Amino acid sequence: MYFANLPQNLRDYFQFPLIHGEWDFLAYEDETFSYQEVLNTSAGLAHVLIDQYGIKKGDKVAFSMRNYPEWIYSYMAVTSIGAVAVPLNSWWQGEELDYGLTHSESSVFIGDEERLQRLEGYVEDIPRIAVRCDASKFTNTVGFNDVVTPNEAFPEVVVDPEDDASIMYTSGSTGYPKGVVSTHRAVVSAPETWALMGQLATQIEVDGEPLASPISGENPCTIAAVPLFHVTGSHAVFLLSLVTARKIVFMYKWDPVEALHLIEKHKVTDMTGVPTMSAEVLQAHKDNPEIDISSLKGLGSGGAARPPEQIKAQEKEHPDKVATVGYGLTETNAHATNASGITLYERPSTAGYPTPFLNLIKIMDEEGNDLGPNELGEVAIKSTCNFRCYLKNEEATNEVLDSEGWFRSGDVGIIDDDGFLYIKDRIKDIVIRGGENIACLEIEAAIYEHPSVREASVFGVPDERLGEKLATRISLNPGKELTEEDLSSFLAAKIAKFKIPEYTWFQNDELPKVAAGKIAKKQMREDAIKELGLG
């Protein structure tokens, strides 16, 4: 099911802001750009991609950088000409960026100085466009401002709803990140539906309070606190802002006190981030009560489960700021369930209710049979927003997408008698640290490359701030020694910093095993939680 009058593609979707083109759209430090300026710069980049790089419909263009306005220009330019946007994780190191570029077969890379430095020595045949830095320091690279001239119109390209729009990489239990391919219809459907449901929810009051905070209306404004390479950032922040005429304020890096100052300066009305951000910004305000954040009416979270205690505290201490939670995955374009206001306060552990019209949620057993209310099983989602496939991985696609369009999420949960979803566990061997999905197998593979390591097991342990932290227990080869510092230095060249385990135990004997001979990861996790006093 989909909306009949939905824009046919992202190119059409980007035309919404033209009715108020002079309004502010992006703010970064001392720079402010109107909707019209953003569209014109994006159109200018689109012409460069076609005229200078020969990009045509279906070609892939990758980009990776901090949350800069150029990220927005890149996404809009690429998708508007029928090419496929490949936003790569800006925390990745050189090997990881190389994998994303090679696997996606990207023809051009757009990046800032940090990313270009990490890519030195990798895929040098791919031309690069440098953002906010000196392009002459890098090979095969030109400067963004040297080649992009604003243009009032995008190049004429026919883009169909079922054409591929994006490839976003997500960590999976198999180790290597999987490229999640989504169509224009799937991507556009997500923000359109949020906007519609948000408008409806603000009109409904329970006990005198609205079910949701307004995301549109008079001078709506949000902060891009989460990375744009995640669907929470790209969809719930960026794309949703286009249809709601919302201004986006960029941060160079997350800092809760700086967020308070930006809220005061720009009169920010709502903020969406991982749960840690919501908690930290409210705690920062306790410590800095002189900063005026009265404009802030909504605090939403996604990317990881928000602790019920946080929601209860927000309701009690900040009743004027409506709490919202959402559940979705890269494979569903961040779309599945949500809850806010009184519906959330009455059941703070819920992941929300399926979004009407577009989403169906059910619980399945291992054989794929439907389960009833309050029965524990795997969460399955059927939605117009679901992805099309995993890039170059038909086997993995078929494992999670059936012929009727149901996506098996890998999350374990229940649906209560009222239809609300509760996430209880994960089937997949993944740790979610501050909203980042980390495949344990990927980290284990990197650890195994060290010559002193005989066996390694990586798992997550609870953390109040980040949700989970990475831990590892390692069995050393006979006669070998290894310190936590040496291991961290070894891994730093191979994987992103956030993937390096924060708790490490070494032992000389073998790791414990279950009856089948597999490493007893569950037991080690339980032992670690006890030892750390987290149970």
Regions found by a protein language model. Give the residues of each.
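Conserved AMP-binding/adenylate-forming core of the ANL superfamily
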Residues: 24-56, 62-68, 72-76, 93-98
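Conserved pre-ATP/AMP-binding loop-to-beta segment of ANL
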Residues: 22, 151-169, 176, 212-221
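Conserved AMP-binding/adenylation subdomain of ANL enzymes
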Residues: 188-224, 229-269, 284
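Conserved AMP-binding A3 loop
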Residues: 34-36, 165-193, 197, 201-202
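Gly/Ser/Thr-rich phosphate-binding loop
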Residues: 172, 243, 265-273, 284-346, ...
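AMP-binding/adenylate-forming catalytic core of the ANL superfamily
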Residues: 92, 109, 271, 383, ...
